[in-house]
Amino acid sequence: MVLSSELLTSILDEVRPLLGQGKVADYIPALAQVPADRLGIAVCTVEGELFTAGDASEPFSIQSISKALSLTLALTLYQEEEIWARVGKEPSGQPFNSLVQLEFEQGIPRNPFINAGALVVSDLLETRLTAPRQRTLELVRRLSGNPAIMADQVVARSEYQHSARNAAIAYLMKAYGNFENEVDKVLQSYFNACAIRMSCVDLARAFIYLANRGVPLGATTPLLPARTTKQVNALLATCGLYDEAGDFAYRVGMPGKSGVGGGIIALIPGELCVCVWSPELNKAGNSLAGTAALELLAERLGRSIF
């Protein structure tokens, strides 16, 4: 089937009956206020063609999708072995905010897409940058072509006020010598990245570099080397959907990254990047209707990385 906005509209119509069966993230009070019936999808091709349906232009809180962007920024600042000495490359099989595995593995997080791993990446950014929050915003604005993108400070404050578990994770890593900076400062930068508001259109454009051998949309020089891009995609395929990464690979067959704001980005290297948004989550913390929409898209296009 040929990619078109009509195809995307038909996919959203097909998954719309799932609305009401999931649950909006309510442990972050500011996120609990997002209307549960929102549903949008955008696909950007490596040539820059854009196809959209539903609420594709409405900004939302990207949450853990930011972890892929933070890792990308870190990879532009550090030798890769400096990063992988402090965070692993393995799926966790545990909830994204688990302390148990971190204690067992002596403060080395399993991967950069669970909270502990993302906090290590934020710590690395804090060490190397004088203004990590601003640099992260500059990166997403440049990648998406949208200079108006901002972080929602109400959401960032809300997350910071409910950050005891993330603080515990950071202090545990500090106890094992795997955290360099002041915990409070790193947490604020971490939550600021999670609170960035982007639309499906923004995100589909922003992540094209991962589908295009490291080259961002409209650019000629790579942000990341092709080899590094391949490695990031491998991590997204194995670790990007919390402890549901295997099921997502089985059903959708694309590298992806989700966030509890209800967004999921996924990509087919050499072809396209897609972002879907529906705030209601399943038990693993991934968008319920969003996952179903991506499964249908992969099926209709007959595309998968496997």
Swiss-Prot record:
EC number: 3.5.1.2
Source domain of life: Bacteria
Keyword Thylakoid in annotation: no
A Gene Ontology BP annotation from the UniProt entry: glutamine catabolic process
Keywords: Hydrolase
The reaction(s) this protein catalyses: L-glutamine + H2O = L-glutamate + NH4(+)
Molecular function terms from GO: glutaminase activity
Keyword Hydrolase: yes
InterPro entries: Beta-lactam/transpept-like, Glutaminase
Positions with a binding annotation for substrate: 64, 115, 159, 166, 190, 242, 260
Subunit note: Homotetramer.
PANTHER family documented for this protein: GLUTAMINASE (PTHR12544:SF29)
Family the UniProt entry places it in: Belongs to the glutaminase family.
Stated name of the protein: Glutaminase
